[in-house]
Every structure is written in structure tokens, then in C-alpha cells.
UniProtKB/Swiss-Prot annotation:
Name of the protein this chain belongs to: 2,3-bisphosphoglycerate-dependent phosphoglycerate mutase
Reactions the enzyme catalyzes: (2R)-2-phosphoglycerate = (2R)-3-phosphoglycerate
Site (Transition state stabilizer): H182
Cited function: Catalyzes the interconversion of 2-phosphoglycerate and 3-phosphoglycerate.
UniProt-listed InterPro entries: His_Pase_superF_clade-1, His_PPase_superfam, PG/BPGM_mutase_AS, Phosphogly_mut1
Classification via CDD domains: HP_PGM_like (cd07067)
Active site, UniProt feature: H9, E87
Keyword Isomerase tagged: yes
Keywords: Gluconeogenesis, Glycolysis, Isomerase
């Protein structure tokens, strides 16, 4: 049996402000730093150990990983940074307040943009300052692969190459893997691992800063999965994530 641990970054400044973040590189709040530190302590106290970590190229996930490494005394851990683990790109919604957007377009439309599998938000114009074209962290990524918007289906397509080419082989080789990423890149992995339908994925909410453990068989098929920590608090956190896109 193999174990894989996934963790969504702690609360970010734009999580707190209820804004669509996507590829915008905002940092953690004080609460987000604390959530990441608590996750590291929980993993250490629960007896977890890791051989390699994967994260995105966005500082909220990277800093979350740093806190976990620090609390586990694993600062030496090899880390793979990949743009493929970035949050889903929210296109023209990037930076907008979720509740205000819902008040303007309606709860149902915003829920479709946020949570449906194959409907992306309106795309950025290629000349928009929010594009990633001139960002040095994407200098080696072909321009045509840099998104101007994404639905979850697009995010799955972006995430799967690093799973197939690097993460899955690492797990099968016996390495203990930790992934510190984002709500939708984790949803993409969970959809694949659990074979969740396109319609059911709409209801899946990933809380900030809570370790999600997968126990996998020899074919990397899930035996079971569970969150570490206070289950009542985790359920409340998931409900809060679900409520973010509503106007009320």
C-alpha cells in the first residue's frame, strides 16, 4: 500500500477578501500561515515522513510547503516546482470579488464558472496585464500552453502530465510524496483518483491547510482517503468554501 498526502495552501489574502485568485501570485494571511504550520505539526505528530514534495510556482502554495517542512524538520526535502500544479486560471474574473460577481451575474452563473467541469469563465484578452506571457517563471512554457482562462476540464488536462510523468512514478518507486497545491489542481487530482463524474465534481470543496491522505493500492487506485484533524472543523471549512461564490 502507498500513501499520498495532498494539502491546499493556507488562507491567502484574496481568499480572505473573497476574490477570484487563479494565477495571481498573492501571499498567505496570518491565518493562512498558522493553518500551514498547524498542518505541519499535525503531520509530524501523526508520524508522517516524506521523501519528495511537489508544489506550484505560486507563493501561497510554496510558503505553505515551507511551513510544513519547517514543522516536520524537513527543510532539506527535494521539491519539484511546476506550473502544472498552479490554481485553475480564472480568466477575466481574476481579482474580482466572488459575492459581487454573483450579485451581478447571478449565483447560478457564478457557480457554473466556479464549479462546473467544462464551462470556463470569460477569457482574458491577450493584451491584458493579468496574462502570464511576460512572467519569468513561465519563460520555458510554450506561449500557446499558457491559459487565458480555464475550466476544471482544462485544469485536469494541465495537471495530468506531471502526475503521469513524475508523481505516479515517484509513488510507485516507494517514495513518500507530499503535494502542496491549490483548490482546483487538487480537485483535478481527486477527480482522477476517485473517478468522480463530471456532474458530481461540482460539489467537491477542498478546505485550506488541511492534509488529505490517500491510501493507494499497487495500481495507485484509492483504498480510502481521509482528512487529518478535527472532522467537525473540517466540515465547517468545506461549507465555507462552498459559500464563497454566493451573493448573500
Amino acid at each position: 500500500m502507498y500513501k499520498l498526502v495532498l494539502i491546499r495552501h493556507g488562507e491567502s489574502t484574496w481568499n480572505k477578501e473573497n476574490r477570484f485568485t487563479g494565477w495571481v501570485d498573492v501571499d498567505l494571511t496570518e491565518q493562512g500561515n498558522l493553518e500551514a504550520q498547524q498542518a505541519g505539526t499535525l503531520l509530524k505528530d501523526s508520524g508522517y515522513m516524506f521523501d519528495i514534495a511537489y508544489t506550484s510556482v505560486l507563493k501561497r502554495a510554496i510558503r505553505t510547503l515551507w511551513h510544513v517542512q519547517d514543522k516536520m524538520d524537513l527543510m532539506y526535502l527535494p521539491v519539484v516546482h511546476s506550473w502544472r500544479l498552479n490554481e485553475r486560471h480564472y480568466g477575466a474574473l481574476s481579482g474580482l470579488n466572488k459575492a459581487e460577481t454573483a450579485a451581478r451575474f447571478g449565483d447560478e452563473q457564478v457557480l457554473v464558472w466556479r464549479r462546473s467541469y467544462d464551462t470556463p469563465p470569460p477569457a482574458l484578452e491577450p493584451t491584458d496585464s493579468r496574462t502570464s506571457y511576460d512572467d519569468p517563471r513561465y519563460a520555458k512554457v510554450p506561449r500557446e500552453e499558457l491559459p487565458l482562462t480555464e475550466c476544471l476540464k482544462d485544469t485536469v488536462a494541465r495537471v495530468m502530465p506531471i502526475w503521469n510523468e513524475s508523481i505516479a512514478p515517484a509513488i510507485k518507486s516507494g517514495r513518500k510524496v507530499l503535494i502542496a497545491a491549490h483548490g482546483n489542481s487538487i480537485r483535478a487530482l481527486v477527480k482522477y483518483l476517485d473517478n468522480i463524474s463530471d456532474s458530481d465534481i461540482v460539489g467537491l470543496n477542498i478546505p485550506n491547510g488541511v492534509p488529505l491522505v490517500y491510501e493507494l493500492d499497487e495500481n495507485l487506485k484509492p483504498i480510502k482517503h481521509y482528512y487529518l484533524g478535527d472532522q467537525e472543523a473540517i466540515a465547517k471549512a468545506q461549507a465555507a468554501v462552498a459559500k464563497q461564490g454566493k451573493a448573500g
